[in-house]
UniProtKB/Swiss-Prot annotation:
Cofactor requirements of the protein: Zn(2+)
Gene field: tgt
Keyword set includes Disulfide bond: no
Pfam families cross-referenced by the UniProt entry: TGT
UniProt-recorded name of the protein: Queuine tRNA-ribosyltransferase
Amino acid sequence: MSRLQFQLQATDGHARRGRLTFPRGTVETPAFMPVGTYGSVKGILPEQIRALGAEIILGNTFHLYLRPGLEVIGDHGGLHGFARWDGPILTDSGGFQVFSLAHRRKITEQGVTFSSPTDGARVFLGPEESMKIQKVLDSDIVMIFDECTPYPATEDVARRSMELSLRWAQRSRDAHDGLGNDAALFGIVQGGVHPDLRSRSLDGLQAIGFDGYAIGGLAVGEPEHERNAMLEHLHPRLPAERPRYLMGVGRPEDLVEGVARGVDMFDCVMPTRNARNGHYFTSFGTVRIRNAKYERDLDTIEPGCGCHACSSGYTRAYLRHLDRCNEMLAPMLGTLHNLWYYEKLMADMRAAIASGTFVEFRRSFYAARGATTPPLPGETS
């Protein structure tokens, strides 16, 4: 029996305001989870992550299993002690990383055999192995092991992939329970961009029973309108009393559109990765700091922003200088800004849902970018 509790506190249209409660803390939803692939959110300290508003982070089962390995993490009592993060952690199952290996993997009914990207050794990973690894990591949310359906995929390929993932979902459930793990276990809805396959996947997962439901395979190159169509299809079918997690999707616009379609949880490397490439997110769009127009710009990244970089007065000209000189401080300050922006965006959406003003919030979000608000189902542009 999982110790996760989910309370749905308010709705506004399809947007949902809720709270996840774990023994290690609470998470207000909708929530964005910074990604700590190797047990670290690149460039910042755990206490800085907490200070900028994040309440839960994501760890990568696949990479942590390969390096440093379970013995080292086990010596620390799990990933929380290893990474010095005392809040909730979600660990992915490794399925997406195996998917990304493409030609270096072989998929069978039992699982996936692949060449390790670290040393080339042959490694096997299946549902049972993934559940054992995540038990050692001692994460608060465990993800089932699944096959991430590629895009594009024919309906037949998507169907066979979805059916394999359903069989693996049952094995994940059985292995998780057999280990006596009381962490939350989330199922993952697959089926590509085929509504009937998505429905069948969700029906099968609900028959097994999970603490939450993730929507996978929608950050693999599909057009935005097809992703949104799948979210719209799933919204009335997903159980209202369970949290919903859209995996790997992360432009600011994607977060707003996901929340508008009933999503509670998001993760993406975009705010941290883009910061390392000199792309800083703001309410009016993206500041690409390598652009020559910022060479003598005395403004902060976003005037009035409360992040450490902006509130301390670091100018765009200074950040551009640091970036051009490959100084470590540039990605550190950029990461602090981008994650602050993402977490504030989520906080603003939570407040708008609670006050019944999400429609107005969404309209003002696009207006600040000089963009037209895209219509939701039933609306006209």
